[in-house]
Amino acid sequence: MNPELVLVVGDMFVPQRSPDIDEQFKTILIPNKLQHVLSLGNIGSRESYDWLKSLSNDFHTVKGDFDEGDISEKKVVQIGEFKIGMIHGHQVLPWGDLDALTTIQRELGWDILLSGHTHQIDIKVKDKKFYINPGSISGSFSYLIADPNPSFILMVLQGEEAIVYSYILNDKSQKFELSKIEFSKGANEYKIVKDEEENEEEEEEDEDKKEKSEKKEKEDKKNEIKEESNEESK
């Protein structure tokens, strides 16, 4: 079974609350490289809708609290062995509350529940079900947070295994913050995996500490020999 690459985005609000998606995101999100695109509503404009739809032949969206037209508020998508539920999230009170999300999940029996509305990226697990919020891909403001960092989720699904990449663009440094987790269908926990760059940095730090320790040992040995020599000369 081939892996399925799934983009999850929410709350674009382009151009109402944000002029556009950051160019760094657009260089990553190339048309026809993704098998599925799942949008959680509040896209903002026809142009934004068309851009998302151009990324994959399999595009799905749900109705946000600012969307108009005949769009479903709930949707289920089957990808591999995973039954994925989609809602915007304004139906959940308090917004983003895990217990409230769990109630919705139990009613519909989804393996993964995707929701937005808070504009803040979040991943949780409860009772062997996974809850993912991709944040706002444009970094548009919300009533909960005035200036969120732009973010989105990429999921790699293969059989009953999932890898979830969280992409966050730090507005101050203009650098990506990338995290990776792995989980299996029906598991009650997930594994946080450090990226290669972080591992390389830790290895460099360990090597630096080792060099400093060896240098200190040599200096201590020299001082010890020097003290012994001084004692003998007395």
Task: Label the model's feature ranges.
Residues 7-10, 36-42, 59-64, 86-88, ...:
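Active-site neighborhood of phospho(di)ester-bond hydrolases with catalytic His/Asp-centered motifs
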